[in-house]
A protein has these predicted regions:
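Membrane-proximal alpha-helical anchors
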Residues: 3-97
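Tandem repeat scaffolds
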Residues: 13-41, 133-288
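Short amphipathic alpha-helical patches
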Residues: 47, 51-54, 58, 122-126, ...
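Hydrophobic repeat-domain scaffold segments
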Residues: 63-168
C-alpha cells in the first residue's frame, strides 16, 4: 500500500546526500509556497469581510440621511411660518410624490421608520377640514381633529405598499387608512395598535404577526363588513369599514382579540380560516 514511497527509500539507502538535500529543499519550498498562498488567501478574505462591513455601515448612514432629509422636507412643505399645518392640494401631491420617491431607495426597516413618523405625526389620518379653505381644524387639545367619515389626510398611501416586503419590522400604531396592502409581506411584524380598517389585505402574509389591539374594522364584529371601493360605510355598525382579508396567511398570528378573531373567521375565506389560530368553530364563513 506504500509502494509509492519506494523511490524515496531507495534514495536514502543510496547515500546520495546531494539528491536528498535537493529533494528536501524542494519539499520545504513547496510547503512554504503553500503556506504563503494560504496566508494571502486568509488576508484577502478578511479584507472582503471588512469591506462588506464598511459598505453595510455606509449604506445605513446614507439611508438615515435620506430619511432625515425626507422628514425635514415634508415638515417644511406642509407647515407655515407659525408651525401650523398648511397643506394645499399641490402640497399634498408633492408630499405623496416625495414619499413614493424615498420608498424606492430605502430598505424595509427604513420604510417602517417613515411609516411610523407619518402616522404618529397624523399625516396619514383623515382630518376634519373647514368647508371654505379646506384647512385642518384643531381639536382644542393641541392636535388636529380626526374625521373618519369625511376627513382628508395629508398623505394617502394608496398603492404604495402593494406587494411590499415589511416582514419583521416595527409598525406599532401605524394608521394605514385604507391602504392597498395586497400581497404585502407582514410576517413577524409588530402591528400592535395599528389601524388596518378599510385596508385591502387580500393575499397578504401575516404569519406570526403581533396583532395586539390591532383594528380591523369599526363597529361590531357581527355587523362589520369589508370595504367595497368608494361605497358608503357606517362607522356605527361597521358596515363597509372592515379590512379585505380574503386569502390572508394567518398562521401563528399572535394576540388576536376575540372581536378580530370573529371578523377574520367570518370574512377571510376557507384558505385563511384553515390558518387562523384558535380555529373557526361556530363562526360561519361569509365567503363560502
Amino acid at each position: 500500500g506504500l509502494g509509492w514511497l519506494d523511490p524515496l527509500f531507495q534514495l536514502f539507502r543510496s547515500g546520495n546526500w546531494e539528491a536528498i538535500g535537493a529533494l528536501g529543499e524542494g519539499v520545504v519550498g513547496a510547503f512554504g509556497q503553500i503556506m504563503v498562498a494560504s496566508v494571502a488567501l486568509l488576508i484577502a478574505w478578511r479584507q472582503v469581510l471588512v469591506d462588506q462591513r464598511l459598505t453595510t455601515q455606509q449604506n445605513r448612514i446614507t439611508q438615515a440621511q435620506t430619511i432625515d432629509s425626507f422628514i425635514h422636507g415634508i415638515s417644511e412643505l406642509i407647515s407655515d411660518e407659525e408651525g401650523m399645518l398648511e397643506d394645499w392640494p399641490l402640497e399634498r401631491m408633492l408630499a405623496e410624490g416625495r414619499l413614493s420617491a424615498v420608498f424606492g431607495s430605502i430598505d424595509k426597516d427604513g420604510k417602517a421608520r417613515v411609516l411610523r413618523f407619518l402616522s404618529h405625526a397624523k399625516l396619514l389620518t383623515p382630518l376634519k377640514r373647514d368647508y371654505r379653505l379646506g384647512r385642518a381644524i384643531l381639536d382644542g387639545e393641541g392636535s388636529y381633529e380626526e374625521d373618519r367619515a369625511a376627513g382628508v389626510p395629508v398623505i394617502r398611501l394608496q398603492q404604495l405598499l402593494k406587494g411590499v416586503d415589511l416582514s419583521g419590522t416595527d409598525l406599532r400604531g401605524v394608521d394605514f387608512n385604507g391602504a392597498d396592502l395586497r400581497g404585502a409581506d407582514l410576517s413577524f411584524c409588530d402591528l400592535t395598535g395599528a389601524n388596518l380598517a378599510g385596508t385591502n389585505l387580500a393575499g397578504a402574509n401575516l404569519e406570526q404577526a403581533r396583532l395586539e389591539e390591532c383594528r380591523l374594522f369599526y363597529g361590531r364584529p357581527q355587523t362589520a363588513t369589508p370595504r367595497l371601493g368608494s361605497a358608503p360605510f357606517d362607522l356605527a355598525t361597521g358596515a363597509g369599514t372592515g379590512a379585505v382579508v380574503e386569502n390572508v396567511n394567518l398562521a401563528s398570528a399572535r394576540l388576536l382579540d376575540p372581536q378580530s378573531h370573529h371578523y377574520l373567521a367570518t370574512w377571510s375565506g376557507p384558505r385563511s380560516r384553515s390558518t387562523l389560530p384558535g380555529g373557526t368553530k361556530g363562526v360561519p364563513s361569509q365567503l363560502g
